[in-house]
């Protein structure tokens, strides 16, 4: 279910503060965050945010087409290692 239009998009306070500081100083540096539920807002465009996937932080460069999506959508948590091998020889 989507978020109500009456509410504002969720952005974690510490993440929003870091982005606003960098925008005021006009600096670009990697922002490390565990907040996968935060929504990407227009002030984040042009920044690189390292999003935690459960094991490591994946650096993601934010572009205008990502606005409105959640940060967690761009850092997959599972890696597909392939289906189980069909080994008929071992069954005999």
Curated annotation (Swiss-Prot):
Gene3D superfamilies: 30s Ribosomal Protein S19, Chain A (3.30.860.10). Disulfide bonds: none annotated. Keywords: Chloroplast, Plastid, Ribonucleoprotein, Ribosomal protein, RNA-binding, rRNA-binding. GO terms for cellular component: chloroplast; mitochondrial small ribosomal subunit. One of its GO terms (molecular function) is rRNA binding. The keyword ATP-binding does not apply. InterPro entries: Ribosomal_uS19, Ribosomal_uS19_bac-type, Ribosomal_uS19_CS, Ribosomal_uS19_SF. GO terms for biological process: ribosomal small subunit assembly; translation. It is found in: Plastid, Chloroplast. Coiled coil: none annotated. PANTHER family: RIBOSOMAL PROTEIN S19P FAMILY MEMBER, SMALL RIBOSOMAL SUBUNIT PROTEIN US19M. Protein S19 forms a complex with S13 that binds strongly to the 16S ribosomal RNA. NCBIfam families: rpsS_bact. Belongs to the universal ribosomal protein uS19 family. This is Small ribosomal subunit protein uS19c. It comes from Drimys granadensis. The gene is rps19.
């Amino acid at each position: 279910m989507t978020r109500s239009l009456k509410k504002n998009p969720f952005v974690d306070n510490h993440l929003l503060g870091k982005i606003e500081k960098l925008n005021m100083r006009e600096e670009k540096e990697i922002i490390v965050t565990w907040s996968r539920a935060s929504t990407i807002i227009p002030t984040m465009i042009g920044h690189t945010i390292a999003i935690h996937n459960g094991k490591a932080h994946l650096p993601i460069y934010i572009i205008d087409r990502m606005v409105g999506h959640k940060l967690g959508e761009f850092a997959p948590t599972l890696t597909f290692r392939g289906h189980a091998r069909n080994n008929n020889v071992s069954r005999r």
